[in-house]
């Protein structure tokens, strides 16, 4: 089992670099930095991380092919690969409609866009001249002036078609989920995609990009996870809620509370223990270890400790290192 950790660049880059270095010292294998227009730039942040770490792999978790042209993405991640001495990974997904609506960007044909972007980015990174007349991605002899070496590409994927595509074309897949029920479905879709193109499914790094909250006091861990879980519930398809026995109307209640900024209601009872169980790896080190082993048995090969990580970030990073990574 590999271990990654997610940081959101709402914090200054040097603060994230401190946490990234600490994560490296605690045995984490990957640091993933989110990419949203309202936060600090992902590639600027990754540059700072590259210069302040030695061995941990660093990547976008995840960018998309709408806000940045694939040639620009290829140039950016190739630069990170060069600066970091070959430690860069690219996390790329379809993005989300709400963000693109706010930016005035049309979210068209995400499956075709993602597939074609990955093909183009691989060719750019390999130093090839790219000519492509795809459904959504088009180039006419564009080429980078330098080669990056090998940069693994991980797809952010949730739905069955995206998961199947990840099995076909990606080195890994980042799945926003944390429960075995969700991964039983996801692993099958990835396997289907891999076998469709004659790949060994074990070549794909199946990653649980999870809401993670750890503390020796389980109540503190649960409270820290509630707001993140609320956003997950509010954005979950009905099918996923039904899979976990969560009433579909809870999505509207929680969505309304988020829209009103009524976080007291979320902390007070709208986010139930059932929701925490379904959408977070949460609790004591022993609780978290049990869930991780359950996921490993299904076929998950990397765990990413995503927001909030724990009620106290530095303490949580050390706890994961000493009580989980060191014992796996």
From Swiss-Prot:
Database matches in Pfam families: Bac_luciferase
Gene Ontology biological-process annotations: methanogenesis, from carbon dioxide; one-carbon metabolic process
Cytoplasm in keyword set: yes
Pathway(s) this gene product operates in, as recorded in its UniProt entry: One-carbon metabolism; methanogenesis from CO(2); methyl-coenzyme M from 5,10-methylene-5,6,7,8-tetrahydromethanopterin: step 1/2
Presence of keyword Oxidoreductase: yes
E.C. code: 1.5.98.2
UniProt cross-references to CDD domains, sorted A to Z: Tetrahydromethanopterin_reductase
The entry's keywords: Cytoplasm, Methanogenesis, One-carbon metabolism, Oxidoreductase
Cited InterPro entries: F420-G6PD/mer (IPR050564), Luciferase-like_dom (IPR011251), Luciferase-like_sf (IPR036661), MeH4methanopterin_reductase (IPR019946)
Known role: Catalyzes the reversible reduction of methylene-H(4)MPT to methyl-H(4)MPT.
GO molecular function terms noted in the UniProt entry: coenzyme F420-dependent N5,N10-methenyltetrahydromethanopterin reductase activity; oxidoreductase activity, acting on paired donors, with incorporation or reduction of molecular oxygen
UniProt superkingdom: Archaea
Family in the record: Belongs to the mer family.
Catalytic activity line of the entry: 5-methyl-5,6,7,8-tetrahydromethanopterin + oxidized coenzyme F420-(gamma-L-Glu)(n) + H(+) = 5,10-methylenetetrahydromethanopterin + reduced coenzyme F420-(gamma-L-Glu)(n)
GO cellular component: cytoplasm
Record's subcellular location: Cytoplasm
Identification of the protein by name: 5,10-methylenetetrahydromethanopterin reductase
